[in-house]
Structures are given as C-alpha cells and as structure tokens.
C-alpha cells in the first residue's frame, strides 16, 4: 500500500509540472491578449490542477492507511513480545531447575563416597514431565507466529531474534531431557553455555519491552 501511495504522489508531481506548463501558457496568452492561448492555458490549468489534487489526495490517503496499519502491527508486536518474554522466562526457570537436578544426581553418582545407591541422571531426566515442557513450547510457538505476522521491520527487534531465542531454548531443553549423550563434563559445559545464552536473550527482550533498547 505504501508503494501505491508513492506512485500517486509521483504522479501528482508529474501532473503539477503539467499545471505549470498550462499556467505559463495562460499567462503568456493573457499578456499578449491571445484569447486562444489564454483559453487553452486556463482550461488546461483547471483540468490538470484538478488531476494533480486528486493524485495528491489519493497518495496521501494510501500512505495514511499504510501508516495506520503499520502502527497497529507494531502495537500488536509489542503486546505479543511481552507475552513471549513472560513465557520464555517461565520456561527458563523450569529448565534451570530440571538441569540442576540432573547435574546434582550425576555429580553425586560420579563423585560421592556415600554407600547408598545413587540415583542415575537418566532416571532423573526421565522423570521430567514432557507435557509440561511441550505446553511451554507450544505457547512460544504461537507467539513466534504472531510476531512474524506483525513484524514491520521498523522496530529494534525483529521476529528473527525471537526465533533464535526460541531455538537456543529448545537446545537447552534437548540437553536437559537427554543429558547422557554429552558425558558429564560436556553436559556441564553445554548447560552453562545454554543457560547464559537464553538468559541474555531474555534480558535483551526485556529491555526492548521496557523501551530501553
């Protein structure tokens, strides 16, 4: 719609040049007292002036509608961004707790001198609710789609940033729910990297939502 508005504004500029041409003809005819030239100039000025005004008003109208739609999308984007951040933080909190539980069980299993039977880290991971985490990610999925639909490209964060934040959180989930594939030291290192990364994503989104970015 902004393209259409710009086209009509461009046409109004061209038409205005025609108006000037007819106005000059009208003026020359008036000065030289040439009724023919004066009549043509006057008629042409009126017609081309009307066309110019019409093009100008249509162009402004289209640009006004486009600006309104863009503003509405940006407001919706901001509203969804706040929902995304709230759900993102809740998911981080849940994953941090689960990840810490795996870490504690695994480190105890490897390094404790306690004679009691240790709890295997995989048993801890297997005890986590898949449904709970799926619910978190389903909500984030829906927010991602809404952000994509309302992304004007004019705000300081785009849909793509939220998608990267989501992907990083999904990696954290996979590590926490399937920890043994990396070995304990790999698990600890990866966990720290994921935890720091998702926390940084969350902080930047919060600054954006607070208007401080």
Region locations from a protein language model:
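Membrane-embedded alpha-helical segments of integral membrane proteins
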Residues: 1-33
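Membrane-interfacial loop-to-transmembrane-helix junctions in polytopic alpha-helical membrane proteins
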Residues: 3-7, 37-40, 44, 155
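C-terminal amphipathic alpha-helix
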Residues: 77-127, 161-213
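Hydrophobic membrane-insertion alpha-helices, especially the h-region
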Residues: 48-63
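Heptad-repeat amphipathic alpha-helical coiled-coil interaction surface used
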Residues: 12, 19, 45, 52, ...
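Short, solvent-exposed, charged loop/turn and helix-capping segments
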Residues: 121-163, 210-213
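Amphipathic, cytosolic membrane-interfacial segments at TM-TM junctions
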Residues: 24-51
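Transmembrane signal-anchor/signal-peptide helices with a preference for the extracytoplasmic
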Residues: 28-33, 59-79
């Amino acid at each position: 719609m902004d393209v259409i508005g710009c086209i009509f504004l461009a046409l109004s500029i061209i038409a205005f040049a025609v108006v000037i041409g007819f106005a000059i003809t009208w003026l020359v005819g008036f000065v030289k007292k040439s009724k023919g030239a004066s009549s043509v100039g006057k008629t042409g000025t009126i017609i081309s002036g009307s066309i110019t005004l019409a093009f100008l008003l249509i162009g402004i109208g289209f640009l006004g509608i486009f600006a309104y739609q863009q503003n509405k999308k940006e407001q919706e984007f901001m509203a969804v961004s706040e929902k995304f951040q709230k759900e993102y933080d809740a998911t981080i909190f849940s994953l941090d707790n689960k990840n810490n539980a795996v870490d504690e069980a695994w480190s105890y299993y490897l390094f404790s001198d306690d004679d009691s039977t240790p709890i295997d880290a995989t048993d801890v991971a297997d005890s986590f609710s898949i449904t709970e985490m799926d619910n978190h990610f389903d909500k984030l999925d829906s927010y991602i789609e809404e952000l994509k639909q309302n992304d004007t490209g004019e705000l300081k964060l785009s849909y793509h940033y939220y998608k990267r934040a989501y992907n990083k959180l999904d990696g954290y989930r996979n590590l926490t729910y399937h920890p043994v594939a990396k070995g304990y030291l790999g698990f600890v290192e990866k966990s720290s990297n994921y935890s720091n990364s998702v926390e940084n994503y969350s902080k930047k989104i919060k600054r954006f939502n607070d208007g401080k970015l």
